[in-house]
Amino acid sequence: MQTHEIRRRFLDHFVRAGHTEVPSASLILADPNLLFVNAGMVQFKPYFLGQEAPPYPRATSVQKCVRTGDIEEVGVTTRHNTFFQMAGNFSFGDYFKEGAITLAWELISKPQSEGGFGFDPERIWVTAYQDDPEAAEIWHRMAGIPKERIQFRDGKDNYWDMGVPGPGGPCSEIYFDRGPAYGKDGGPVADEDRYLEIWNLVFMQDVRGELSPKQGHPPIGSLPKKNIDTGMGIERVAMLLQGVDNVYETDLLRPIIGKAEELTGRRYGAEHASDVRFRVIADHARTAAMLISDGVNPGNDGRGYVLRRLLRRIVRSARLLGAEKPVMAEFMQVVSDLMSPSYPELATDFDRIRTVAVGEETAFLKTLTTGSTLFDNTAAAVKAKGGTKIAGADAFTLHDTYGFPIDLTLEMAAEAGLSVDEEGFRSLMAEQRRRAKEDAAARKHAHADLSIYKELVDRGATEFTGFDELTSEAHVLALIADGVRVPTATQGQDVEVILDRSPLYAESGGQIADRGSITASGLKLRVNDVQKIAKKLWVHKTTVEQGQITEGDVVLAQADPAWRRGATQGHSGTHMVHAALRQVLGPNAVQAGSLNKPGYLRFDFNWQGQLSEQQKADIEAVSNDAVGADFPVNTFVTDLPKAKQMGALALFGENYGDEVRVVEIGGPFSMELCGGTHVQHSSQIGPITLLGESSVGSGVRRVEAFVGLDSYKYLAKERALLAGVASSLKVPSEEVPARVEQLVERLKVAEKELERTKIAAVLSSAGKFVEEAERVGRVLLVAAAAPEGVAAGDLRTLATDIRGRFGSEPAVVVLLGNADGKVPFVVAVNKSAQEIGVKAGELVGSFGPSIAGRGGGKPEMAQGAGSDPSGIPAGLAAVRARVAEIAG
């Protein structure tokens, strides 16, 4: 039975039993506790916790899952996969243990002709939690499982939770006995290779708390309703129903191995070391394609690093198997062909998936070549000294200087019979991060001692009033000058002012700080910047322009209205551009960073490849259409689960509190978690003009734009520029493109004609060189200085022409040029001279030192350049001497 049919039978069985079929969620969810979705119940977590009312009492799904905690074991054994499909059925306060067990038994035992899986009931074993005799009794009573095939296990094996705070409960696992050939008797407690788990039924009833050293994630309460969460590994069931020994032999993985055999010329099953690499390729190729499809791009941390690691392991495994050419495009194609019947997005988004994977392969091949050589040298040096461990400093150098990832160093070290001082490596990495943080903090806070703020932070947060007003009365809590608390500051002095409340926005979320003032009777301070300390204390960096400020003063803090207006236009404009990007490019265009300041925005997003002119035009058009629609801009505070349910975009890696602020523009057009300041209606943003798009790193693109008045000024400048060009060309503005294109074509024609004239002039001297050829032994030699100013490319043309004029007569042509202080040279040797023993590449060594030059080539043609024109005569003499040695 093919995997796609197994998947379909599972879903159909539960739909017939009153379940709603729910599509797989993305592997990427806005859950700060999860790197990737790792279980079928993840998308239903709010229902299990009672945070949201489920829209259906019963559900069934086949969820894409990724677990990467044991990447190193993939391929070494046949039990590990990083990607798998988890089929599940779920009950939200509807049926419980008896219903779950009955439905599971029907599907696994029903004959295939009746829509079931047709497992032999006599080979089914089950386990139950040690404190759950009820489940065992149901299995015996409802399914007829003999008591001797029902085994009890402790919480380590038969109590399920997510490994993070959340729902959990006792579980009952279903096993299939593969027979004595796979291990010893005794049931699952004796041998889990022979007795293979195929389904886990979790009786969800508890809430698990934060991690405790002694208790793990301890139960901290009961769920509002008892629920059912089950998980069946589709790949394992496929292995059993297809009658193969392991998942790598199934219909969704073996073809990838087959493609690897084709590309490497090696055969799977011939030796263990090669088989490991074949399995790594098969597993990782599938996982990588699924991750890219769901919006992950290669990076240096988090999800991006996991993907990068998977792709690089594929490349290295293929190289070790003998692949000499790039392989990623073909592996991605096989995965798409295999998986798209169940996940059609792999086919519709294939071009992007392939581009991302191939881009990482291309980049890594450069690193792999250099890094492998350096690693081999390091490993050889360790072994030469009788050592067994690569020093942490060496691993750090490979990583930091040459971009060789530590996980690859560990893997290669193990293959070489060596270990790595991981503690030393991580210590150096930690030291590097510490220095970077200290440097950043010192730059940000003018080398201040950050401990000086601790007392102030402990006293409480600055109340930010800037969402509601631009002017607020406040008390001066502290003054800091040159890193020291001071009681007062006077005119001309730079001082940091800490207030109990402030309307000035502190730099965060990509939005730069407000500018403004702090005033009182006879007092005025200019606010140059506002920074946050510990995310709660507003530090106003100011200059005293008039009077004296004293700790304890009551002052008036004011944000500059024009500055704030421009900043809000920039920040709201960023949300518009983000929404437009996702509308034009799709949901995989995920924010990677931003900068918002008055009149300007910069937005970084995950995307592979340059945007087309049409895409940029569409993004600008969608953004400005939304501006013109005069959408209302609403902000509200809600809890994180509610915000996610509403569809608000959250950035992975951000730490959100229990309550979050949502900024909504035009209802579904844009909804993001955001703490910044915004306009009240989208029309207040003004025109948005994209300035350009560029790359800022692997898989990250950047767009920049002007907004509001700055956008108008930019467009006015562009209009004036166009008018000037039109005037110079003496055509109307609308005819400028056609006129420029016409002039460009004329220029191309003129350049070609000039090139032909130049070549003709160069070749006109060929006859003179032939006439002046000198006989040196058995060859005719032209060794001369070329006409001054002849470029390297023209030298080659001239030398080739001269060589051809000698026919079958053995001939050698050496021309040394002199252009802009450089000495380009060309050596041309015909076939007759080569047969005598004269080789062009070897001749370079005879005259190269005279002109401080280097070069090389093939026996018939060599070229290069030197930097010392004064050595040309000596170089030509050296050529004559060397030719005489060979052909004399």
UniProtKB/Swiss-Prot annotation:
Pfam families: DHHA1, tRNA-synt_2c, tRNA_SAD. CDD domains: AlaRS_core (cd00673). Its main location: cytoplasm. It is found in: Cytoplasm. Its cofactor is Zn(2+). Keywords: Aminoacyl-tRNA synthetase, ATP-binding, Cytoplasm, Ligase, Metal-binding, Nucleotide-binding, Protein biosynthesis, RNA-binding, tRNA-binding, Zinc. GO terms for molecular function: alanine-tRNA ligase activity; aminoacyl-tRNA deacylase activity; ATP binding; tRNA binding; zinc ion binding. The keyword Glycoprotein does not apply. This is Alanine--tRNA ligase. It comes from Nocardia farcinica (strain IFM 10152). The gene is alaS.
